[in-house]
Protein backbone atom coordinates (compact mmCIF):
# COMPACT_ATOMS: atom_id res chain seq x y z
CA UNK A 1 0.00 0.00 0.00
CA UNK A 2 2.77 2.44 -0.86
CA UNK A 3 3.59 4.39 -3.97
CA UNK A 4 6.47 2.00 -4.69
CA UNK A 5 3.88 -0.70 -5.45
CA UNK A 6 2.81 1.31 -8.49
CA UNK A 7 6.08 0.46 -10.28
CA UNK A 8 5.33 -0.75 -13.79
CA UNK A 9 1.59 -0.13 -13.38
CA UNK A 10 -0.80 2.10 -15.30
CA UNK A 11 -1.81 4.91 -12.95
CA UNK A 12 -4.78 7.12 -13.78
CA UNK A 13 -5.36 10.66 -12.66
CA UNK A 14 -7.30 13.61 -13.97
CA UNK A 15 -5.74 16.08 -16.38
CA UNK A 16 -5.00 19.47 -14.85
CA UNK A 17 -5.19 18.44 -11.19
CA UNK A 18 -2.56 18.70 -8.48
CA UNK A 19 -2.49 14.89 -8.47
CA UNK A 20 -0.62 14.99 -11.79
CA UNK A 21 2.15 17.09 -10.24
CA UNK A 22 2.12 14.99 -7.10
CA UNK A 23 2.51 11.73 -9.00
CA UNK A 24 5.44 13.07 -10.99
CA UNK A 25 7.11 14.41 -7.86
CA UNK A 26 6.79 11.06 -6.06
CA UNK A 27 7.86 9.15 -9.16
CA UNK A 28 11.04 11.21 -9.43
CA UNK A 29 11.80 11.26 -5.68
CA UNK A 30 11.23 7.55 -5.15
CA UNK A 31 12.61 6.21 -8.42
CA UNK A 32 9.29 4.53 -9.14
CA UNK A 33 8.41 4.29 -12.81
CA UNK A 34 4.78 3.88 -13.81
CA UNK A 35 2.72 4.70 -16.87
CA UNK A 36 0.48 7.73 -16.50
CA UNK A 37 -2.97 7.60 -18.08
CA UNK A 38 -5.24 10.62 -17.95
CA UNK A 39 -8.96 11.10 -17.75
CA UNK A 40 -10.55 14.32 -18.95
CA UNK A 41 -12.52 14.50 -15.68
CA UNK A 42 -12.81 12.43 -12.51
CA UNK A 43 -15.54 10.17 -13.90
CA UNK A 44 -13.39 9.44 -16.94
CA UNK A 45 -10.37 8.69 -14.74
CA UNK A 46 -12.43 6.31 -12.62
CA UNK A 47 -13.73 4.64 -15.78
CA UNK A 48 -10.09 3.93 -16.75
CA UNK A 49 -9.74 2.00 -13.49
CA UNK A 50 -13.17 0.38 -13.63
CA UNK A 51 -12.63 -0.84 -17.19
CA UNK A 52 -9.16 -2.25 -16.46
CA UNK A 53 -7.29 0.31 -18.57
CA UNK A 54 -5.58 1.54 -15.37
CA UNK A 55 -4.36 -0.34 -12.31
CA UNK A 56 -4.87 2.55 -9.89
CA UNK A 57 -6.47 5.99 -9.73
CA UNK A 58 -4.69 8.64 -7.64
CA UNK A 59 -6.86 11.54 -6.50
CA UNK A 60 -8.29 13.28 -3.43
CA UNK A 61 -9.93 10.85 -1.03
CA UNK A 62 -13.33 12.53 -1.23
CA UNK A 63 -13.39 12.27 -5.02
CA UNK A 64 -12.27 8.63 -4.92
CA UNK A 65 -14.91 7.80 -2.30
CA UNK A 66 -17.64 9.45 -4.36
CA UNK A 67 -16.63 7.54 -7.48
CA UNK A 68 -16.52 4.25 -5.59
CA UNK A 69 -19.95 4.89 -4.06
CA UNK A 70 -21.42 5.43 -7.53
CA UNK A 71 -19.59 2.55 -9.23
CA UNK A 72 -21.41 -0.39 -10.82
CA UNK A 73 -19.77 -2.64 -8.21
CA UNK A 74 -18.55 -0.48 -5.30
CA UNK A 75 -17.23 -3.53 -3.41
CA UNK A 76 -14.64 -4.02 -6.18
CA UNK A 77 -12.76 -0.87 -5.10
CA UNK A 78 -11.18 0.56 -1.97
CA UNK A 79 -8.98 3.47 -1.01
CA UNK A 80 -5.57 2.23 0.12
CA UNK A 81 -2.10 3.45 0.83
CA UNK A 82 -0.44 6.43 2.34
CA UNK A 83 -1.74 9.99 2.15
CA UNK A 84 0.37 11.58 -0.57
CA UNK A 85 -0.38 15.19 0.33
CA UNK A 86 -2.47 17.48 2.46
CA UNK A 87 -4.01 20.32 0.52
CA UNK A 88 -6.22 23.02 1.94
CA UNK A 89 -9.66 23.59 0.51
CA UNK A 90 -10.69 27.23 0.45
CA UNK A 91 -13.40 29.65 -0.48
CA UNK A 92 -12.29 32.30 -2.95
CA UNK A 93 -13.46 35.83 -2.22
CA UNK A 94 -12.72 39.15 -3.94
CA UNK A 95 -9.24 40.33 -2.98
CA UNK A 96 -10.21 43.89 -2.07
CA UNK A 97 -13.34 43.24 -0.03
CA UNK A 98 -12.25 42.75 3.59
CA UNK A 99 -15.81 43.12 4.90
CA UNK A 100 -17.05 40.24 2.75
CA UNK A 101 -14.04 38.11 3.71
CA UNK A 102 -14.75 38.79 7.38
CA UNK A 103 -18.40 37.80 6.89
CA UNK A 104 -17.42 34.53 5.17
CA UNK A 105 -14.85 33.74 7.86
CA UNK A 106 -17.40 34.47 10.59
CA UNK A 107 -19.99 32.23 8.93
CA UNK A 108 -17.51 29.35 8.68
CA UNK A 109 -16.39 29.79 12.30
CA UNK A 110 -20.04 29.82 13.42
CA UNK A 111 -20.78 26.63 11.46
CA UNK A 112 -17.85 24.88 13.11
CA UNK A 113 -18.73 26.16 16.60
CA UNK A 114 -22.44 25.32 16.46
CA UNK A 115 -21.93 21.84 14.98
CA UNK A 116 -23.36 22.64 11.55
CA UNK A 117 -20.09 21.82 9.73
CA UNK A 118 -19.81 18.28 11.14
CA UNK A 119 -23.55 17.78 10.51
CA UNK A 120 -23.07 18.76 6.85
CA UNK A 121 -20.12 16.36 6.61
CA UNK A 122 -22.31 13.56 7.92
CA UNK A 123 -25.12 14.50 5.52
CA UNK A 124 -22.96 14.42 2.40
CA UNK A 125 -20.35 11.78 3.26
CA UNK A 126 -21.90 9.35 5.77
CA UNK A 127 -25.64 9.28 5.11
CA UNK A 128 -27.65 8.20 2.05
CA UNK A 129 -27.85 10.93 -0.60
CA UNK A 130 -31.13 11.07 -2.53
CA UNK A 131 -32.35 10.20 -5.07
CA UNK A 132 -30.24 7.01 -5.37
CA UNK A 133 -29.45 6.92 -1.63
CA UNK A 134 -25.74 6.48 -2.29
CA UNK A 135 -23.53 6.55 0.79
CA UNK A 136 -20.05 7.94 0.07
CA UNK A 137 -18.68 6.49 3.32
CA UNK A 138 -15.84 8.94 3.89
CA UNK A 139 -15.09 9.43 7.58
CA UNK A 140 -13.96 12.81 8.84
CA UNK A 141 -10.15 12.79 8.87
CA UNK A 142 -7.96 14.02 11.71
CA UNK A 143 -6.54 16.62 9.29
CA UNK A 144 -10.02 18.03 8.59
CA UNK A 145 -10.90 18.05 12.29
CA UNK A 146 -7.65 19.93 12.94
CA UNK A 147 -8.37 22.41 10.14
CA UNK A 148 -11.80 23.16 11.62
CA UNK A 149 -10.25 23.61 15.07
CA UNK A 150 -7.60 25.97 13.67
CA UNK A 151 -9.24 28.09 10.97
CA UNK A 152 -6.67 30.25 9.20
CA UNK A 153 -5.55 31.98 6.01
CA UNK A 154 -2.34 30.01 5.51
CA UNK A 155 -1.24 29.50 1.91
CA UNK A 156 -1.12 26.00 0.42
CA UNK A 157 2.67 25.95 0.71
CA UNK A 158 2.42 25.96 4.51
CA UNK A 159 0.49 22.69 4.40
CA UNK A 160 3.17 20.96 2.35
CA UNK A 161 5.87 21.58 4.96
CA UNK A 162 6.51 18.78 7.45
CA UNK A 163 6.47 20.01 11.01
Question: PLM features: what roles do these ranges have?
Answer:
Residues 1-11:
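Flexible hinge/capping segments at coil-to-helix
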Residues 3, 20-24, 42-46, 50, ...:
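Extracytoplasmic/secreted envelope proteins and their assembly/folding machinery
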Residues 19-38, 68-73:
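Ligand-binding cleft/hinge of the Venus flytrap
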Residues 36-51, 85-87:
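Short helix-initiation/N-cap motifs at beta->coil->alpha
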Residues 61, 69-105, 127-151:
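Periplasmic-binding protein-like
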Residues 147-163:
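Short, low-complexity, Pro/Ser/Thr/Gly-rich segments in the mature regions of secreted, periplasmic
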